[in-house]
């Protein structure tokens, strides 16, 4: 029997759990939250759609009862607070690092063999913290960011091409942030051909720019962070792992020399299967792409340095 736990029953966590249930990715999905009644209520609400939508997955909610998460195959961590007005980056990292570290440690008490998928922000840094604090093999800790950024890239590509998003291929690597992500326009294809056969270089650059501010655009429209695509991206990553699909998905993973970087978690394409990260795929980047990746990694290293400043590592 397969089991997935989603920690954090906010918008992103609940959406992730809902997609996992609707697509019957696991036999059981457990939602855990610190706020009493929230995960229980959302789980009950989801289960009341089972007959309407025709799924058999069981969704259970609990308040801080990690025993209910026991023997999970995959655990998705969405816990943390959003950045508040006047809050420094270091303050946000200090708070979220404490939350994520505590959650991960509690999860491993009951599911020592679980694969962790990190969504909490700043995502690359929280993935790095989880790996360093827990001492798990690097194949078992995965940051979701690149899956979401690539999905947004494909959305904007499809809008420019006037086609379905499933007809295009596109990938975003680098840090999960609007100044650090790198939409790989050179690798983007439509019906197996370079998208530049169909749209101008100028239009393609506009697509890349829209992708980079995709999250900020939604925050401006919604007044809060997006949740449908982030939650679905988390579920997409979980499905490739749990069903051993061996999909190539850009995710934040620990590098040891790949792409010329070490001691960092950052977005690169990986093959995801039953062991988590089955393989890191090294693309043949050109000089411009390499320079952008190095700059992105430098920025992520800078954010990671704050972990030591706040005593999280």
Curated annotation (Swiss-Prot):
Highest taxon, organism lineage: Bacteria
What does it catalyze? (S)-malate + NAD(+) = oxaloacetate + NADH + H(+)
Write out the catalytic residues in the record: 176 (proton acceptor)
Looking up InterPro entries in the UniProt record yields: L-lactate/malate_DH, Lactate/malate_DH_C, Lactate/malate_DH_N, Lactate_DH/Glyco_Ohase_4_C, Malate_DH_type3, NAD(P)-bd_dom_sf
Q: Name one GO molecular function term.
A: L-malate dehydrogenase (NAD+) activity
An example Gene Ontology CC term for this record: cytoplasm
> What GO terms describe the biological role, i.e. biological process, of this protein?
carboxylic acid metabolic process; tricarboxylic acid cycle
Q: What is its EC number?
A: 1.1.1.37
Question: Which positions bind NAD(+)?
Answer: 8-13, 33, 96, 119-121
Q: Answer whether the UniProt record assigns the keyword Oxidoreductase to this protein.
A: yes
**This protein's UniProt keywords:** NAD, Oxidoreductase, Tricarboxylic acid cycle
Enzyme class (EC, first level)? oxidoreductase
Report residues binding substrate: 83, 89, 121, 152
The text of the family note is: Belongs to the LDH/MDH superfamily. MDH type 3 family.
Q: What is this protein's function?
A: Catalyzes the reversible oxidation of malate to oxaloacetate.
PANTHER family membership? L-2-HYDROXYCARBOXYLATE DEHYDROGENASE (NAD(P)(+)) (PTHR43128), L-LACTATE DEHYDROGENASE (PTHR43128:SF16)
| Entries under NCBIfam families matching the protein | MalateDH_bact, PRK06223.1
| Protein name stated in the entry | Malate dehydrogenase
What is the species listed in this Swiss-Prot or TrEMBL entry? Bacteroides thetaiotaomicron (strain ATCC 29148 / DSM 2079 / JCM 5827 / CCUG 10774 / NCTC 10582 / VPI-5482 / E50)
């Amino acid at each position: 029997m397969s089991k997935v736990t989603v920690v954090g029953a906010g918008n992103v966590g609940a959406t992730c759990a809902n997609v996992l249930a609707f697509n019957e990715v696991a036999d059981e999905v457990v939602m855990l939250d610190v706020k009493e009644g929230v995960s229980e209520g959302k789980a009950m609400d989801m289960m009341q759609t089972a007959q309407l939508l025709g799924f058999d997955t069981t969704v259970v909610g609990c308040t801080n009862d990690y025993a209910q998460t026991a023997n999970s195959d995959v655990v998705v961590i969405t816990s943390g607070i959003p950045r508040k007005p006047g809050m420094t980056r270091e303050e946000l990292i200090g708070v979220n690092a404490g939350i994520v570290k505590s959650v991960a440690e509690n999860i491993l008490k009951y599911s020592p063999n679980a694969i962790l998928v990190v969504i909490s922000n700043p995502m690359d840094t929280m993935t790095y913290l989880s790996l360093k604090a827990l001492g798990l093999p690097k194949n078992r800790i995965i940051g979701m960011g690149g899956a979401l950024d690539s999905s947004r890239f494909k959305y904007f590509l499809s809008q420019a091409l006037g086609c379905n998003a499933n007809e295009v291929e596109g990938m975003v690597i680098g840090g999960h942030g609007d100044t650090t992500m790198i939409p790989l326009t050179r690798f983007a294809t439509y019906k197996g051909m370079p998208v530049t056969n169909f749209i101008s270089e100028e239009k393609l650059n506009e697509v890349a720019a829209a992708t980079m501010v995709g999250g900020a655009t939604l925050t401006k429209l919604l007044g809060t962070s997006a949740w449908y695509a982030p939650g679905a991206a988390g579920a997409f990553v979980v499905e490739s792992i749990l069903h051993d699909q061996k999909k190539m998905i850009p995710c934040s993973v620990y590098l040891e020399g790949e792409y010329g970087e070490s001691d960092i978690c950052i977005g690169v394409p990986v093959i995801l299967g039953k062991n988590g990260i089955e393989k890191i795929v090294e693309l043949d980047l050109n000089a411009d792409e390499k320079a952008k990746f190095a700059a992105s990694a430098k920025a992520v290293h800078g954010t990671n340095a704050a972990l030591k400043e706040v005593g999280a590592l």
